[in-house]
Amino acid sequence: MRVLIDACVLYPTVMRELVVGAAKLGLFEPRWSDRILEEWARATRKIDDAAEVFARGEIVMLNTAFPRAIISVKGGLEQRLWLPDADDVHVLAAAISGSCDGIMTMNNKDFPREILTDEGLIRFGPDEFCCRMLAEDPIGMRGVADAILAQAHAMGGESWEMRALMKKARLPRFGKALV
């Protein structure tokens, strides 16, 4: 299954690491466009310049790990498409250009199911998607989640519980399913 990952899923670290971890397990084929990756990098500027540099390094590593993930949008496609937020049309165009099965996004209102269905696409929320991946490979996804929890402990010095970390990362159902 090919899934286009929206920038809003790539930007939060825990969410990104979990979704990318599922892709590394071979549970799905990730897709993105240069524009989506650029949106992610620019969004990190709100933190500081170092965060943007870090994000750009992460982007290089992602493109190296998944060389077939990058999608080039077919010329003229965006002009025939419509979404409630015109700034998101490029995401839909990338999913169509990449022959994706779905789009993973947190922006449900900007990606109406009816419009996506007309284009042969499914909308996935990251929490729902990660729960599906957990059902497909419980051992693998548990391993990914455990590694993220260990990294959170190492980086933050805070003592996180899995469910609390996943809830903070806006993945509450996934966190509950792990317990």
Feature-to-residue mapping (PLM):
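Metal-dependent nucleic-acid phosphoesterase active-site entry motif
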Residues: 1-17
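PIN/NYN-family metal-dependent endoribonuclease catalytic core
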Residues: 13-47
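Residue-level detector of structured alpha->beta connecting loops
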Residues: 27, 99-100, 120
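Domain-scale selection of a single, long terminal region
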Residues: 41-74
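Active-site neighborhoods of divalent-metal-dependent phosphate/nucleic-acid chemistry enzymes
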Residues: 67-102, 136, 152-157, 168-179
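Short beta-strand and adjacent tight-turn residues that come in two discontinuous sequence segments
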Residues: 105
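Acidic, PIN/NYN-like endoribonuclease modules and their adjacent C-terminal/linker elements
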Residues: 108-179
